[in-house]
Amino acid sequence: MRRRLARIALIAIIVFGLGFGVNFYLNNYTGDGKGTPEEVLPVDRDYVWIDGPISEKAQRYFFFADGKYFGTALLTKNYKGWSDELSTSSLLPSTLAENKIAAAYSDSEILFGLIKASGEVKVTVNNHESKRIPLAELSKVAVELYNVQGYEIWYVDLAKLKEPKSYLIKVLDKNDSLLNELSI
């Protein structure tokens, strides 16, 4: 009886070890394996890339593509090199009114969108202030093609939000007065 239990335990340990090994291999030794994040970025469309948040193991880019799309791509680094892990895009919203949020997008890790900020405003999601990236660095050709003069990208890490099922996005002025809100 004891030998039977020992064999069952040994088999369970071997199966667990194999599962762990396969998971470790797939997470750390698969993917594109490029030397830099820029080498991994897709080139199948006419992209305009905008640097987003960066860490030692991940780099996020926002992008405009083909004159009508807006999205984000997440690149990750493992032992093999940099790989494209996740990307999402949607149609670029039509011209935005000042200090209005028309739409929000998500790739299950961040919530992001565009705003045409006028004056000192902040964008909050569930009372958590978002980070913003001004599009002033874009070339004049890109600004005209995508009609994003004066726009900024706002984003918030979903892991920092307490209630991930619903989001209340607010645009507040410098006195924290509500200018616009969107609930999703």
Segments predicted by a language model, with ranges:
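Short, Lys/Arg-enriched, disordered terminal segments
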Residues: M1-L10, G31-T36, D173, S177, ...
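Hydrophobic membrane-insertion alpha-helices, especially the h-region
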Residues: A6-F24
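N-terminal export/targeting and maturation segments
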Residues: G19-P93
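Ser/Thr-rich low-complexity repeats and stalk/linker segments
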Residues: R45, V123-I184
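Structural signature of eukaryotic scaffold interfaces centered on beta-propeller domains
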Residues: D51-S55, A104, L161
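Short, surface-exposed beta-strand/loop "edge" segments at domain boundaries and coil↔beta transitions
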Residues: G67-L74, P93-T95, V121-K122, E163, ...
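Extracellular ectodomain segments of secreted/surface proteins
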Residues: T88-F112
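Short proline/glycine-enriched turn/loop motifs at strand-loop junctions of beta-rich domains
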Residues: I115-V121
